[in-house]
């Protein structure tokens, strides 16, 4: 059974789960547990044409339901995933009203959740935390979480495109409205690696990994704020000291094949150092990068092992839990079908 969830009576925890839908898509056209979702969510899954996209949408919904179910102790059938107002339309969970509480078998616990999801190239992930809403209304205490997945080989083989440093530089130019001049220059000169130590092919591979590392970091940060690519300050958000995480040999371990997260990123906004956000990026296997960003709620910069920027607040255990690979049948089906013990 899935663990790594927090409650109002425990220290904050940043839970991170993911589902690899590639085996599902390769083995069946079925949509397992689709019938356990709300009708609107079932429709949203089935609207996709390609099976792999249906499976990613299904996995995204199942992860959101599971996270709410386990943290808020809400019956699966009562879970309704909402969205924040326009223009952002970010998935969220709105706690029930008092009248709704009475209809729940065990009652609403008063716990709310903050979460964010990402999906790319058949990989789906959620990062989130539980918290008790602050009666004082101080938004600075509310946690904010962002997560993003990139696939470093996403463009490989597209339309016969040559994979070279020159094609990478041309590709980077498309994103001049996303990255700052300094970030574009850092990617072009392959920051973080010695060009004399790698072959031409490996330099190209590193260049693409570096680009997608920057992309994942930027997406995770702006998704944390709720702005996404609509943020007017996108180019003013700058990352430096960025190193692309190396590919990780895939062992077939059911726990996943994550490398050591890279935590040395320096973040500035309008040239000012951002000190309240914790951000990191890690490689999964050879193709994927997962970036996570968080602030507030005891899971921001001060939650780093050893404390915050001033070295204070040492914790006995890192509240950021490692990514955990979930299996739909083993980990989610008991909760979705009402045979788990989560509410007891």
Swiss-Prot record:
A Gene Ontology molecular function term of the record: magnesium ion binding
Reactions it catalyzes: apo-[ACP] + CoA = holo-[ACP] + adenosine 3',5'-bisphosphate + H(+)
Stored InterPro entries: 4-PPantetheinyl_Trfase_dom (IPR008278), 4-PPantetheinyl_Trfase_dom_sf (IPR037143), AASDHPPT_N (IPR055066), P-Pant_transferase_sf (IPR050559)
Keyword vocabulary terms for this entry: Transferase
Cellular component aspect of the GO annotation: cytosol
E.C. number: 2.7.8.7
Matches recorded under SUPFAM superfamilies: 4'-phosphopantetheinyl transferase
Keyword Transferase found: yes
Consequences of knocking out this gene: Essential for growth.
GO-annotated biological processes: lysine biosynthetic process via aminoadipic acid
Effect annotated for changing residue 217 to R: In cfwA2; abolishes penicillin biosynthesis
Keyword Transferase assigned: yes
Gene3D superfamilies (alphabetical): 4'-phosphopantetheinyl transferase domain
Family: Belongs to the P-Pant transferase superfamily.
Stated role: Transfers the 4'-phosphopantetheine moiety from coenzyme A to a Ser of an acyl-carrier-protein. The enzyme is able to transfer the cofactor to a broad range of enzymes with acyl- or peptidyl-carrier protein domains. Required for primary biological processes such as growth and asexual/sexual development, and activates target enzymes involved in the synthesis of metabolites such as fatty acids, polyketides and nonribosomal peptides, lysine, siderophore, penicillin, sterigmatocystin, shamixantone, dehydroaustinol, and pigments.
PANTHER family, alphabetized: L-AMINOADIPATE-SEMIALDEHYDE DEHYDROGENASE-PHOSPHOPANTETHEINYL TRANSFERASE, PHOSPHOPANTETHEINE TRANSFERASE
The protein, known as: 4'-phosphopantetheinyl transferase NpgA
């Amino acid at each position: 059974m899935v663990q790594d969830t927090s409650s109002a009576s425990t220290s904050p925890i940043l839970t991170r789960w993911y589902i690899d839908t590639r085996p599902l898509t390769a083995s069946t056209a079925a949509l397992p547990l689709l019938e356990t979702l709300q009708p609107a969510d079932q429709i949203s899954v089935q609207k996709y044409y390609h099976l792999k996209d249906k499976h990613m949408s299904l996995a995204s919904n199942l992860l959101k339901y599971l996270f709410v179910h386990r943290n808020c102790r809400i019956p699966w059938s009562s879970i309704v995933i909402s969205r924040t107002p326009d223009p952002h339309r970010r998935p969220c969970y709105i706690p029930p009203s008092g009248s709704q509480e009475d209809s729940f078998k065990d009652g609403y616990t008063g716990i709310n959740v903050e979460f964010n999801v990402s999906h790319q190239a058949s990989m789906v992930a959620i990062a989130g935390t539980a918290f008790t809403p602050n009666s004082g209304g101080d938004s600075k205490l509310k946690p904010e979480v962002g997560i993003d997945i990139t696939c470093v080989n996403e463009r490989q083989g597209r339309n016969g495109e040559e994979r070279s440093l020159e094609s990478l530089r041309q590709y980077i130019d498309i994103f001049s409205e996303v990255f700052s001049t300094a970030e574009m220059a850092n990617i072009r000169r392959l920051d973080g690696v010695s060009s004399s130590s790698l072959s031409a092919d490996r330099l190209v591979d590193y260049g693409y990994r570096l680009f997608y590392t920057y992309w994942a970091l930027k997406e995770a940060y702006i998704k944390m704020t709720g702005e996404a690519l609509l943020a007017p300050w996108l180019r003013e958000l700058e990352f430096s000291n960025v190193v692309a995480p190396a590919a990780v040999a895939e062992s077939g371990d059911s726990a996943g094949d994550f490398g050591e997260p890279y935590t040395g990123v320096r973040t500035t906004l309008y040239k000012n150092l951002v000190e309240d956000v914790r951000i990191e990026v890690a490689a999964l296997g050879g193709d994927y990068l997962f970036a996570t960003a968080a602030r507030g709620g005891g899971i921001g910069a001060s939650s780093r092992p050893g404390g915050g920027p001033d070295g204070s607040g040492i914790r006995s255990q890192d509240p950021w839990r490692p990514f955990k690979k979930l299996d739909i049948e083993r980990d989610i089906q008991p909760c979705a079908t009402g045979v788990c013990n989560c509410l007891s």
